[in-house]
Protein backbone atom coordinates (compact mmCIF):
# COMPACT_ATOMS: atom_id res chain seq x y z
CA UNK A 1 0.00 0.00 0.00
CA UNK A 2 1.05 3.58 -0.49
CA UNK A 3 2.50 2.95 -3.95
CA UNK A 4 2.14 5.78 -6.45
CA UNK A 5 1.47 5.05 -10.11
CA UNK A 6 1.09 7.16 -13.25
CA UNK A 7 -1.71 6.09 -15.60
CA UNK A 8 -1.83 7.53 -19.15
CA UNK A 9 -5.24 8.56 -20.43
CA UNK A 10 -5.95 8.06 -24.16
CA UNK A 11 -3.92 10.42 -26.36
CA UNK A 12 -6.30 13.10 -27.67
CA UNK A 13 -7.07 12.86 -31.39
CA UNK A 14 -9.18 15.54 -33.03
CA UNK A 15 -11.17 13.95 -35.86
CA UNK A 16 -13.09 17.14 -36.65
CA UNK A 17 -12.36 19.87 -39.18
CA UNK A 18 -11.88 22.55 -36.50
CA UNK A 19 -9.31 22.86 -33.69
CA UNK A 20 -10.27 22.01 -30.11
CA UNK A 21 -8.97 23.11 -26.70
CA UNK A 22 -9.02 20.52 -23.93
CA UNK A 23 -9.89 22.26 -20.67
CA UNK A 24 -10.15 19.38 -18.18
CA UNK A 25 -9.69 15.63 -17.89
CA UNK A 26 -10.74 13.15 -15.23
CA UNK A 27 -11.06 9.46 -14.53
CA UNK A 28 -14.78 8.82 -14.04
CA UNK A 29 -14.80 5.62 -11.96
CA UNK A 30 -12.21 5.50 -9.19
CA UNK A 31 -12.83 2.55 -6.85
CA UNK A 32 -12.21 2.53 -3.13
CA UNK A 33 -8.57 1.75 -2.45
CA UNK A 34 -7.36 4.14 -5.16
CA UNK A 35 -6.98 7.89 -4.75
CA UNK A 36 -6.30 10.27 -7.65
CA UNK A 37 -3.65 12.71 -6.40
CA UNK A 38 -3.50 14.92 -9.49
CA UNK A 39 -3.68 15.11 -13.25
CA UNK A 40 -0.89 16.31 -15.48
CA UNK A 41 -0.31 16.92 -19.18
CA UNK A 42 3.09 16.19 -20.70
CA UNK A 43 4.78 16.29 -24.10
CA UNK A 44 5.37 12.87 -25.69
CA UNK A 45 8.84 14.05 -26.77
CA UNK A 46 9.81 14.85 -23.16
CA UNK A 47 8.88 11.33 -22.01
CA UNK A 48 10.34 9.52 -25.05
CA UNK A 49 6.94 8.06 -25.92
CA UNK A 50 3.77 7.23 -24.03
CA UNK A 51 4.30 5.64 -20.61
CA UNK A 52 0.98 3.77 -20.33
CA UNK A 53 1.55 2.75 -16.71
CA UNK A 54 4.58 3.67 -14.63
CA UNK A 55 5.43 3.27 -10.96
CA UNK A 56 6.95 6.26 -9.18
CA UNK A 57 10.65 5.88 -8.47
CA UNK A 58 11.36 3.15 -11.03
CA UNK A 59 14.29 3.70 -13.40
CA UNK A 60 12.05 3.61 -16.49
CA UNK A 61 9.52 6.11 -15.08
CA UNK A 62 9.86 9.69 -16.34
CA UNK A 63 10.55 12.27 -13.65
CA UNK A 64 7.24 14.05 -14.13
CA UNK A 65 7.97 16.61 -11.39
CA UNK A 66 10.90 17.90 -13.48
CA UNK A 67 8.95 18.09 -16.76
CA UNK A 68 6.79 20.94 -18.00
CA UNK A 69 3.17 20.32 -17.02
CA UNK A 70 0.87 21.62 -19.76
CA UNK A 71 -2.32 21.09 -17.71
CA UNK A 72 -2.21 24.65 -16.35
CA UNK A 73 -3.87 25.98 -19.54
CA UNK A 74 -6.07 24.47 -22.24
CA UNK A 75 -4.27 22.07 -24.56
CA UNK A 76 -4.87 22.88 -28.24
CA UNK A 77 -5.29 20.04 -30.72
CA UNK A 78 -5.36 21.05 -34.42
CA UNK A 79 -8.09 19.76 -36.74
CA UNK A 80 -7.48 16.22 -37.96
CA UNK A 81 -4.42 15.64 -35.76
CA UNK A 82 -3.32 13.77 -32.66
CA UNK A 83 -1.95 15.77 -29.78
CA UNK A 84 1.73 15.72 -28.82
CA UNK A 85 0.48 16.34 -25.28
CA UNK A 86 -0.95 13.43 -23.28
CA UNK A 87 -2.65 13.39 -19.89
CA UNK A 88 -1.64 11.34 -16.85
CA UNK A 89 -3.50 10.52 -13.66
CA UNK A 90 -1.20 10.23 -10.64
CA UNK A 91 -2.83 7.65 -8.36
CA UNK A 92 -2.04 6.20 -4.96
CA UNK A 93 -3.04 2.78 -3.64
CA UNK A 94 -4.61 3.36 -0.21
CA UNK A 95 -6.12 -0.12 0.29
CA UNK A 96 -6.42 -3.28 -1.83
CA UNK A 97 -8.64 -2.16 -4.75
CA UNK A 98 -11.57 -4.46 -5.52
CA UNK A 99 -12.40 -2.93 -8.92
CA UNK A 100 -10.66 -1.32 -11.87
CA UNK A 101 -10.19 2.36 -12.57
CA UNK A 102 -12.21 3.06 -15.71
CA UNK A 103 -13.68 5.61 -18.11
CA UNK A 104 -11.79 8.81 -18.95
CA UNK A 105 -13.65 12.09 -19.42
CA UNK A 106 -12.36 14.93 -21.58
CA UNK A 107 -13.90 18.41 -21.45
CA UNK A 108 -13.08 20.64 -24.39
CA UNK A 109 -14.16 23.69 -26.34
CA UNK A 110 -14.58 24.11 -30.06
CA UNK A 111 -15.83 27.23 -31.78
CA UNK A 112 -16.92 28.78 -28.49
CA UNK A 113 -19.01 25.77 -27.40
CA UNK A 114 -18.22 23.40 -24.54
CA UNK A 115 -18.31 19.62 -24.99
CA UNK A 116 -17.75 16.55 -22.81
CA UNK A 117 -16.64 13.18 -24.17
CA UNK A 118 -16.13 10.01 -22.14
CA UNK A 119 -13.78 7.38 -23.56
CA UNK A 120 -13.08 3.81 -22.58
CA UNK A 121 -9.93 3.37 -20.54
CA UNK A 122 -9.16 0.90 -17.78
CA UNK A 123 -6.50 0.24 -15.19
CA UNK A 124 -6.24 -2.68 -12.81
CA UNK A 125 -3.86 -2.40 -9.87
CA UNK A 126 -3.39 -5.27 -7.45
CA UNK A 127 -1.69 -5.39 -4.09
CA UNK A 128 0.51 -8.37 -3.22
CA UNK A 129 -0.90 -10.31 -0.30
Regions found by a protein language model. Name each.
Residues 1-129:
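Non-catalytic macromolecular-recognition regions in eukaryotic signaling proteins
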